Structure formats: C-alpha cells, structure tokens
C-alpha cells in the first residue's frame, strides 16, 4: 500500500498544530494508520539591522527574526482519506506538501 508523507511549514505554530489536528481527525474517521505529527527542527532566520541610518554614533542593532515551524505526518494513502485531505481548509500562510511513496 502507498503511503502519503505530508510536510507542513508555517511561521505560526498554533496554525500548524490546528492543521495537524484536522489531519488526525481525518485519519481517525477513515480508519487509516497515522504516524506523527513529528516536529522537525524550527528554523530561525535572524536579520541584524543598524538602528542608526547614517552610521554615526554608537553601534546599536535591532535583531529581527522569523521562526519557521515544520511538522511531518505519514499516513496510508487511502483514496477516501486523500480526497478528504485535499478538501480541508488550510490557512494561506501554512505550506503543505504531499508526497506519495510506495
């Protein structure tokens, strides 16, 4: 049987967890095996910026950062489960990637 590997990415971890819960509910309703959600390492993107625009004075810095949270879910690729998975509403700032493996 094929397996579907689902990778979720987003900057808001609460929205990522909400989508994980929706996928868990689909797996329970359809009765397919589910492994996960497996939390992958959070990537921190840090950008240091000088506060002073002209370069004079003391060197004070602002540090802006964005955290990218990732989750990995494996489930059996049942046709009914995948159809329901494709119909779920996912927030537009959450990236979802589905790969079918044999």
From Swiss-Prot:
Top-level division of the source organism's lineage: Archaea
Keyword tags: Ribonucleoprotein, Ribosomal protein
Molecular function GO labels: structural constituent of ribosome; tRNA binding
GO cellular component terms listed in the entry, alphabetical order: small ribosomal subunit
InterPro entries, sorted: Ribosomal_uS10 (IPR001848), Ribosomal_uS10_CS (IPR018268), Ribosomal_uS10_dom (IPR027486), Ribosomal_uS10_dom_sf (IPR036838), Ribosomal_uS10_euk/arc (IPR005729)
GO BP: any one term: translation
Similarity comment text for this entry: Belongs to the universal ribosomal protein uS10 family.
Role noted for this protein: Involved in the binding of tRNA to the ribosomes.
Complex and partners: Part of the 30S ribosomal subunit.
HAMAP family, per database record: Ribosomal_uS10
Name by which UniProt lists this protein: Small ribosomal subunit protein uS10
Gene field: rps10
